[in-house]
Swiss-Prot record:
The gene is pyrG. Homotetramer. The active site is at residues 385, 511, 513. It comes from Protochlamydia amoebophila (strain UWE25). The lineage of its organism: Bacteria, Pseudomonadati, Chlamydiota, Chlamydiia, Parachlamydiales. PANTHER family: CTP SYNTHASE, CTP SYNTHASE-RELATED. This is CTP synthase. One of its GO terms (biological process) is 'de novo' CTP biosynthetic process. Catalyzes the ATP-dependent amination of UTP to CTP with either L-glutamine or ammonia as the source of nitrogen. Regulates intracellular CTP levels through interactions with the four ribonucleotide triphosphates.
Length: 542
């Protein structure tokens, strides 16, 4: 069978949920026994999002091979079994950089290098390459970032037009659009969607399926109108209403409307019935939880919805595994009082606290005092990346007695550099793509909470950092009750730390949130939630 290609574009406005829709479609196709490969094309000129502010871009999702990618790849991972790598995300910056390097090398033999055909050819090659990451890929699902009509998106849309023409019997175009509801008029308006489709048709792309993001149910009359003016079959007008309970409703809702069957019909793919009972069970747990646990997130970017997207989702997965509902409280670390009593009052009401990764000194002390509170009050604490470094420095200052302990990231001249720059990072000039990135093997110490969670002596986790725990202080810290529970294979670098005689206080240098699924929660998030439930019951008796 020839490989099929599905292109998903967006119209009217951004942030409609193309990534979620793409992931949900990928899941449904996999349930039909198809092998799916996912690709995100981003029109921005950055080579990757690694140096972009979380306030602008949201989180940076890291793959096993060390690619810093768009957060939509996190959705792909959580919903599908698609293999994700550097080939799963391409930006304008990468594509232009590749073409310019070839021109400098003389690969174009003196030709004038242009957007068409050189840039568009490179885009098409990236699409083909994505389908070759693994053998026997049946469907390549390509999400195009941005909105129809954006100047930055034009080369990508032109490349898709050409690709669809070249593979006309093996391509499908899905357009995700917004159908607004005007409360004052009490009406749903289809005109923005009509114009969005007109933009695509003017480029030469003719959508086969229209997915309509909306706040209210669309009447048959509205769907008929969209079908008529957008020139698609009535069955191909799919409603994607705001979810009531969870984003994990999306694949179930799309399946009920038959989008997976329609895709298989249009692409002449096998169309067996599918079993979504696992996802139905997840939704049932969300609707009828045993109870509620509350986690406090103490970080720099907590007010941005997507800055810690994978962390929030992984916590939800852990709660689902226990049959509980998760409530999240967000605390901006730089605004927390540093007095212990005032801090306890400010962040009270949580069953556990998580300090996620981040860069920069802002909020550093607020995080340290949060870790101190958790250690002293025996409250569950989970530190990720910088959160582990916070835990180490707090322990060094307040337990070991190294009052000047710090990270050289914030105080290069500290007399007690408990956290220091990785040796391979010294002397680097560029910021982009130069951190320790991707999957590394970690050896776990027996009889630790980390070992109990993983039930394995060796694990693989993904990294994104420049600084590490300084082994000069290891013996001194361990004598005081600091446990190095996991180390980098072949080296003695601290990957996991625990506090002895604490119910659950763990810090990890890696990013476990990148390897958690609703159907397969990460063991550390699962056990963190369990520790929170135990703490909640000890405080409230239920």
């Amino acid at each position: 069978m020839q490989t099929k290609y599905i292109f998903i574009t967006g119209g009217v406005c951004s942030s409609l949920g193309k990534g979620l829709t793409s992931a949900a479609i990928g899941l449904l196709l996999e349930k039909k026994g198809l092998r799916v490969s996912m690709l995100k094309l981003d029109p921005y000129l950055n080579v990757d999002p690694g140096t972009m502010s979380p306030f602008q871009h949201g989180e940076v999702y890291v793959t096993d091979d060390g690619a810093e990618t768009d957060l939509d790849l996190g959705h792909y991972y959580r919903y599908t079994n698609s293999f994700l790598s550097k080939a799963s995300n391409a930006t304008s910056g990468q594509i232009y950089n590749t073409v310019i390097k070839r021109e400098r090398h003389g690969d174009y033999l003196g030709k004038t290098v242009q957007v068409i055909p050189h840039i568009t050819n490179e885009i098409k090659q990236r699409i083909v390459n994505c389908g070759k990451q693994q053998e026997n890929i049946d469907v390549v699902l390509v999400e195009i970032g941005g909105t129809a009509g954006d100047i930055e998106s034009l080369p990508f849309l032109e490349a898709i037009r050409q690709f669809t023409y070249d593979h006309r019997n093996n391509c499908l175009n899905i357009h995700l659009t917004y159908v607004p509801y005007l409360k004052a008029a009490g009406e749903v308006k289809t005109k923005p969607s009509q114009h969005s489709v007109q933009v695509l048709r003017g480029i030469g792309i003719f959508p086969d399926i229209i997915v309509c993001r909306c706040e209210v149910n669309l009447s048959d009359e509205v769907k008929d109108k969209i079908s008529l003016f957008c020139n698609v079959n009535r069955r191909a007008v799919i409603e994607e209403k705001d979810v009531e309970h969870s984003i994990y409703e999306v694949p179930l809702d799309l399946h009920k409307q038959g989008i997976d069957a329609l895709i298989c019909e249009l692409l002449h793919l096998p169309n067996p019935s599918i079993n979504l009972s696992e996802w139905e069970k997840i939704l049932e747990t969300i609707k009828n939880p045993k109870g509620t646990v509350t986690v406090g997130i103490v970080g720099k970017y907590v007010q941005h919805q997507d800055a810690y997207k994978s962390v929030f989702e992984s916590l939800t997965h852990g709660a689902l595994a226990a049959g509980y509902k998760l409530q999240i409280k967000r605390f901006e670390a730089d605004k927390l009082p540093l007095d212990d009593n005032q801090l306890a009052k400010t962040i009270e009401g949580c069953d556990g606290y998580l300090v996620p990764g981040g860069f920069g000194e802002r909020g550093w002390l607020g995080k340290i005092h949060t870790a101190k509170l958790c250690r002293e009050k025996k409250i569950p604490y989970f530190g990720i990346c910088l959160g582990m470094q916070v835990m180490a420095v707090e322990f060094a200052r307040h337990v070991v007695g190294l009052n000047e302990a710090n990270s050289t990231e914030f105080d290069p001249d500290t007399i007690h550099p408990v956290i220091s720059l990785l040796s391979e990072q010294r002397g680097l000039q560029d910021l982009g793509g130069t951190m320790r990135l991707g999957a590394y093997i970690c050896d776990l110490k027996l009889h630790t909470k980390a070992y109990q969670a993983y039930k394995s002596s060796q694990i693989s986790e993904r990294h994104r950092h420049r600084y590490e725990f300084n082994n000069t202080y290891k013996e001194q810290m361990e004598k005081a009750g600091f446990v190095v529970a996991g180390t980098l294979k072949g080296e003695n670098l601290c990957e996991i730390a625990e506090v002895k005689d604490h119910p659950w206080m763990i810090g990890v240098q890696f990013h476990p949130e990148f390897k958690s699924k609703p159907t397969d929660p990460h063991p550390l998030f699962r056990d963190f939630i369990q520790a929170m439930i135990i703490y909640h019951k000890s405080q409230h008796g239920k």
